[in-house]
């Protein structure tokens, strides 16, 4: 019998390789390979992994149509040609220029999909199912939107560093206009032209201000975007700071994505919840002993000792006092009272497979910064399929309370206003009112319910 290496040498085309690999697979391995999104959906209904849902089926049909369109698609970038001369004399004679107009040029690429609806309706499940069906698209990625934007900001920083001395217009001290999102978009599109974004949300002004130029360039490169969100595109960055500068991005998104509303009124994450729980209420049980017992069990499965650990990220040290292998035993103060951001939580989610969080208080708008960090933390851990054990002051459904509101802005909010040169009229922006946190808490509670399930705890190994 020929070895796999010899067999591969006999094959010329990618299609033949796929056929050969299928011949070498067992029927069980093939059961979910080479299926279309609709076939995969119906198979999951038949196996009772999913419950029949008319809204989900309608969205799956739209994904099926896109899947068929992408079979014969190859991206063809459309770029603006620049006519300015190069070399010494070209740079010497350059006149002072305004920033070039950034507009959609590539309208031949298939439109992607923007799937929005309430929490737990199956948006991410359907997108992941679609993604897994696209086996014959090598240049693809599935990414949480916060992680994607963290990478984008890192690439922008790198591009600016590598650019070197900036060209200046003739007889002017001003540097010539430079758009770092263009080379960043080219790098991203060269790596992946099918991009599936989970939890497309915009809460950060630094993200909001670059999305129009970034995605215009990405779409001009020919990328196809699939996104899930809890908000309609028109409601993204609602009441955000300087939203007027963000609104043009909504037009770009609507131009290149079909919008699918997906709201069946059912939160499937809460259905058939396991009897076991990894959420302990301090007033109802000896939560401290329960958490310590869980930590000892988890440590027994690690090849390490209990010790502090430091993660270095972008030149910054992030130290945790109690870890064992890939298990982190932490508390709310260590994770949410410190000024940590999305990129820090991404590092935690990628380094640890299990995180214990002690002493989570009831979260009110008096703790708005900590509330925002906790929401970001849970989103990131969920996306990385990290297992979570929590001890909290109140039951899960009471974890967020919006009855108590601060009378004055916190010091860090005042600092933000000073940095952006904002006046008192801007205090109604969502970053100050807590509107985004109020909108996001349903998703966080829903995910915490799912993260207690046995099925969730058993699947983490697949993502490592």
UniProtKB/Swiss-Prot annotation:
Keywords for the protein's UniProt record, in alphabetical order: ATP-binding, Nucleotide-binding
Residue intervals passing through the bilayer: none
Residues the entry annotates as binding ATP: 117-124
Gene Ontology CC terms: mitochondrion
Gene Ontology terms, MF aspect: ATP binding; ATP hydrolysis activity
InterPro entries found in the cross-reference section: ATPase_AFG1-like, P-loop_NTPase
Pfam family, one: AFG1_ATPase
UniProt xrefs under PANTHER family: AFG1-LIKE ATPASE (PTHR12169:SF6), ATPASE N2B (PTHR12169)
Protein family: Belongs to the AFG1 ATPase family.
NCBIfam families tied to this protein: ZapE (NF040713)
Protein name: Putative ATPase N2B
């Amino acid at each position: 019998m020929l070895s796999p290496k010899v067999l591969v040498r006999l094959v010329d085309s990618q299609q033949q390789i796929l056929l050969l690999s299928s011949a070498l697979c067992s029927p069980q391995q093939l059961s979910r390979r080479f299926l279309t999104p609709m076939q995969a959906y119906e198979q999951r209904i038949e196996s009772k992994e999913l419950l029949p849902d008319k809204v989900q089926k309608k969205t799956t049909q739209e994904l099926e149509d896109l899947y068929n369109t992408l079979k014969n698609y190859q991206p063809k970038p459309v770029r603006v040609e620049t006519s300015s001369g190069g070399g010494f004399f070209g740079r010497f004679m350059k006149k002072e220029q305004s920033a070039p107009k950034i507009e959609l040029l590539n309208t031949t690429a298939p439109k992607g999909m923007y799937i929005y609806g309430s929490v737990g309706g199956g948006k991410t499940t359907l997108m992941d199912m679609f993604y897994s069906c696209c086996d014959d698209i090598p240049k693809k990625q599935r990414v949480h939107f916060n992680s994607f934007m963290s990478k984008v900001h890192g690439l922008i920083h790198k591009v600016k560093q590598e650019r070197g001395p900036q060209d200046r217009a003739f007889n002017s001290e001003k540097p010539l206009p430079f758009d770092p999102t263009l080379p960043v978009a080219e790098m991203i599109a060269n790596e992946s032209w099918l991009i599936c974004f989970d939890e497309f949300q915009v809460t950060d002004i630094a993200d909001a201000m670059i999305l129009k130029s970034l995605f215009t360039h990405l779409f001009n490169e020919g990328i196809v975007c699939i996104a899930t969100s809890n908000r309609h595109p028109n409601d993204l960055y609602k009441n955000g700071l300087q939203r007027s500068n963000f609104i043009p991005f909504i037009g770009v998104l609507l131009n290149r994505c079909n919008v699918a509303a997906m709201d069946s009124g059912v939160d499937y994450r809460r259905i058939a919840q396991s009897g076991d729980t990894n959420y302990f209420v301090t007033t109802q049980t000896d939560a401290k002993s329960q958490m310590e017992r869980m930590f000892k069990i988890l440590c027994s499965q690690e090849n390490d000792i209990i010790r502090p650990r430091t993660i270095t990220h972008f030149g910054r040290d992030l130290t945790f006092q109690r870890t064992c292998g890939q298990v982190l035993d932490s508390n709310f103060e260590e994770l949410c009272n410190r000024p940590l951001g999305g990129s820090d939580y991404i590092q935690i989610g990628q380094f640890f497979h299990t995180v214990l969080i002690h002493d989570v208080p009831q979260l009110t708008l008096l703790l708005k910064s900590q509330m925002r960090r906790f929401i970001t933390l849970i989103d990131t851990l969920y996306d990385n399929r990290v297992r979570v054990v929590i001890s909290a002051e109140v039951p899960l459904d009471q974890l967020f309370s919006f009855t108590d509101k601060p009378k004055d802005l916190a010091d860090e909010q005042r600092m933000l206003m000073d940095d952006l040169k904002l006046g008192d009229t801007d205090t109604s922006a969502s970053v100050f009112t807590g509107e985004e946190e109020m909108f996001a808490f349903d998703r966080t509670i829903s995910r915490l319910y799912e993260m207690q399930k046995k099925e969730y705890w058993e699947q983490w190994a697949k993502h490592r």
